[in-house]
């Protein structure tokens, strides 16, 4: 994945955290990563572990490995302009029980910064305590979990609620990426709270 930002684009000068671990759905990491680069931002891969992480393709086949830029324990939300959370069942299941990841996610909401989550990534939003009263979407199997956590779940390709962008699956990536760039370009959302 490229890390060079386009200097003449709407996100020039912005830095975006991508929170992922082993088992991340590869296209849900690489597609938004390339979209923010094309829009001028610098993406940073944040993970519970240092070194590299290995992606999956459709949760079954091993994908490529990606170099971690910083650990979630060392990362601080104030150093980023927004957060993207790719899915992948294994990735999301590991991330949602990681206390450092939960705190990192919650800090973006407390600082009113844009957050984007696709597929199974909203599991971590539940554990971070930031979905109650929110309108969002996810992979359909998370519907009950999100409703039980107080969210209003809808079946739409992309949903934006005060700086929180969510989508259902890789099929929604074009719409997801466009909204990620739009929300990041708008900057802080004062109604984005934990």
PLM regions with names:
Residues 1-111, 115, 124-132, 143-194:
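Extended, subdomain-level signal for the structured scaffold at the beginning of enzyme domains
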Residues 136:
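Anionic-ligand binding patches
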Residues 119:
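Catalytic nucleophile serine of serine hydrolases
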